[in-house]
């Protein structure tokens, strides 16, 4: 026998399953049917512009029932109610997991959140489809469901597919969040022309978290790129650390899913939450 095949990573396993899911979805609803549904889909807002509006630091709050690393986080959670808690707390973006097997999310969750924030008008948070996207079909699905952006994970895409999905997303009016975890992926993301790059502190191969990842990689990006720090963020100190490293946004999932008052927690992360102990504001 030849050399042993490396064990598939968690990312490999999820992507392989997603490819099967997409093949099934195409049989149930061909791409032409989705294309036809585009006419009635809600108009996306500019994701980068919406994040920059909350300078110096935008919070993207994530709706996540479960994950491969933690198992169930909040399995019975109502995605729409949680999304509205995030919106009321001042989130610039709401990331909705739509992967069904490991994260227990659905496209219906995303459509529901998008419908609910519609009432806020132009100030509404942008809605991100958080998934393992490997096919234009999923980008179409996202747009029809009301997404303003989609996640593209560099580790799961070759350069050609990354470029193709970036272009296709932009044609549909969505600026993607392009996710990286190491220097090689960061260079690939920059070369692809990504405008919003998310540095994931969690390695999707092992699911280990290292908050130093953002510190190390942020300096590789050029000035025009909007950087977001993803994973492992739970305190105002974490946010300040990533802001100092050059990030303009943080994506926060698990700590908000577990918070008693997610809206207040977002205020705390943004530094806009006023508690009785912080009275220095009045001295300005």
Regions found by a protein language model. Name each.
Residues 5-76:
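An N-cap/entry alpha-helix motif that binds or orients negatively charged groups
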Residues 14, 61, 86, 94, ...:
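Conserved, mostly hydrophobic/aromatic
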Residues 32-42, 68-74, 92-113, 201-205:
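Glycine-rich, proline-tolerant flexible connector loops at the mouths of alpha/beta enzymes
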Residues 54, 104-128, 154-155, 161-179, ...:
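Alpha-helix-loop-beta-strand connector modules within alpha/beta enzyme cores
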Residues 60-78, 125-134, 175-179, 228-233:
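Active-site mouth loops of central-metabolism enzymes
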Residues 90-91, 116-119, 144-150, 170-174, ...:
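Glycine-enriched alpha-helix->loop->beta-strand junction motifs that scaffold or abut catalytic
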Residues 96, 141-161, 198-207, 245-266:
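Glycine-rich phosphate-binding active-site loops on the catalytic face of alpha/beta enzymes
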Residues 134-145, 181-192, 229, 233-252, ...:
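Catalytic cores of alpha/beta
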């Amino acid at each position: 026998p030849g050399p042993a095949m490396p064990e598939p990573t968690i990312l490999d396993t999820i992507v392989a399953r997603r490819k099967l899911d997409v093949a099934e979805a195409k049989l149930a609803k061909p791409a032409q049917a989705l294309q036809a549904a585009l006419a009635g889909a809600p108009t996306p807002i500019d994701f980068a512009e919406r994040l920059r509006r909350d300078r110096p630091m935008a919070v993207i709050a994530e709706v996540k029932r479960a994950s491969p690393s933690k198992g169930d986080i909040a399995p019975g959670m109502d995605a729409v109610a949680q999304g509205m808690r995030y919106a009321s707390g001042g989130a610039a973006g709401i990331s909705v997991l739509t992967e069904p097997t490991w994260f227990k999310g659905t496209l219906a969750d995303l459509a529901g959140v998008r419908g609910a924030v519609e009432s806020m008008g132009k100030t509404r948070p942008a809605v991100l489809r958080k998934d393992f996207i490997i096919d234009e079909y999923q980008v179409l699905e996202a747009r029809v469901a009301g997404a303003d952006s989609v996640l593209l994970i560099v580790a799961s895409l070759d350069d050609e597919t990354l470029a193709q999905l970036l272009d296709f997303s932009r044609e549909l009016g969505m600026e993607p969040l392009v996710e990286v975890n190491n220097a090689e992926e960061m260079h690939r993301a920059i070369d692809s022309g990504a405008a919003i790059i998310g540095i994931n502190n969690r390695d999707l191969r092992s699911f280990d978290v290292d908050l130093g990842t953002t510190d190390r990689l942020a300096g590789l990006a050029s000035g025009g790129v909007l950087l977001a720090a993803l994973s492992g963020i739970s305190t105002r100190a974490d946010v300040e650390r990533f802001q100092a490293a050059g990030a303009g946004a943080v994506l926060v999932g698990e700590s908000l899913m577990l918070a008693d008052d997610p809206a207040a927690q977002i205020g705390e992360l943004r530094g806009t939450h006023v508690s009785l102990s912080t009275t220095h504001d009045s001295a300005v």
